Amino acid sequence: MDFYTTDINKNVVPLFSKGTVARTASKAQYPSWCNNALKLTNILLKSLRCKFQTNRCEDDRGFEVYCVILKSIALLMAAKESLILLQIPPSLPSGFPFRSPQLSFTYLSTRLSGSQHKSTHSHHINHQTHPIHSSSSNSNSNNRIPTKTDSSKQHTQHFSFANAGASNRDELLSIVRKIDKSNLKCCDCGSTATVEWVSINLLCILCIKCSGVHRSLGSHISKIRSLTLDNFTSLELMHLLQNNVSNSNVNAIYESNLRNFPVKKITANSDDSERSKFIIDKYQFKKFVIDSNQGREASLKSLIKAIHLDSVFMMQRAIAQSKYSLRELTASEKEQNDLNHSSIFQYSLKHYEIVDGTPIFFITEFLLCNGIHIDNLPKITTNWSPKVLEYWETKLEMYGTFQAVNTSRPRSGPHLNMHSNVDSASSYNKKHDLRVNIPERSASASKRWSLSSIPKSSQNLMSPTNLLTMHKSLKLAKKDKK
């Protein structure tokens, strides 16, 4: 088995000539040694995170302590990445695309200046771990620090709202607001009134006015749900809502280049036209995103790296910076790779978190919310656990059947880009005898309305005068009979 490490340039390189390290990794006690090192790193990170959150930068001395803690966290994260890289072979199959020294890791920026004092103090760094794959969300995006919740809170805040009542939905709203202080205000206009709407694919919370504009964009751009009215039955979606909704993270991506435009951010008092134009430029055209024109290869590399590190923030950034939609990326990736290579969808299924003995496929769920293609169930299932296959089958039944039905519907909108997975859905339906009754459509059925039902002759048209005359004639006829 090959092992991997990082070189001086922080790139992934094979660990075949590292002497003592390679021999240690090949010994039987390697798993216990690695797990103990990870546990120690997690303990140190947890302690530093507590110090980081409680420390206040009210004076120069406090800011110096703040910088020391931040640098220590960065060093520990770098050490933890080295430990994670030793576990790449179990999670990254042989022949997976882009497994090369170009798959480099970005590190948390420790270059803080006085001008960044206020902006960074409002963020907090938390780290998420699980037994299968350790995660690290250390990304250097315009000197903004992504926000994640504490791993200890993730296990205590994971609820099932299958039969959610009003009190439970209010509790969910309270949890989402406590994740990040930025969630107390609307992500787009900063309003504090009725901030109860969430975009489940963008992972931001909105006011009722901005949520209406998001709905008009289409579900392929923003999927809007109500935190107080809708029921969330998916464990994976609940995990994302309870741990990854952050307005500051979304604005760090979609407003990263806003200062270079003469456009001002909208406020709660902005009119409807200003609000609509700003939100369309922000999310549909990605006008304020830095480097939002990445090609397929660069986008796929960023996406694979984000999945490997279990970083939702990095996946958000990879999707935002690509000039292609996630559906287009995965479709092209599926065409380029042969059947012996794992797809991005299959690779994401190997990254999950165990909560109370149940695997939570939150990485795959986030990708599904953003339109990733779903593969057919494999013919050989020996390499997949029953829980993975169960989740896979459920999502294929949900999204695959839905796409098969939607293939008969006309596309609307000049910017709508929906490529349906017809072959995968139809083959899956035949295998599992999922019968979907789709009415046959005529040649003119693609039109919303037709002129065929309107009579060509004007004589057949009834005017109000003709109706009145007919009404009188009927009365006269009745009198004649009497």
From Swiss-Prot:
Other remarks on this protein: Present with 396 molecules/cell in log phase SD medium.
Biased composition range(s): Basic residues: 118-127
Subcellular localization, as worded in the UniProt entry: Cytoplasm
Pfam families: ArfGap (PF01412)
Keyword match Translocase: no
UniProt biased composition (Low complexity): 134-143
GO BP term, pick one: intra-Golgi vesicle-mediated transport
Organism: Saccharomyces cerevisiae (strain ATCC 204508 / S288c) (Baker's yeast)
Protein name: ADP-ribosylation factor GTPase-activating protein effector protein 1
SUPFAM superfamilies from the UniProt entry: ArfGap/RecO-like zinc finger
SMART domains linked: ArfGap (SM00105)
Gene Ontology molecular functions: GTPase activator activity; phospholipid binding; zinc ion binding
Ranges where the Arf-GAP domain occurs: 170-297
Keyword check for GTP-binding: no
Region annotation (Disordered) ranges: 116-156
C4-type zinc-finger residues: 186-210
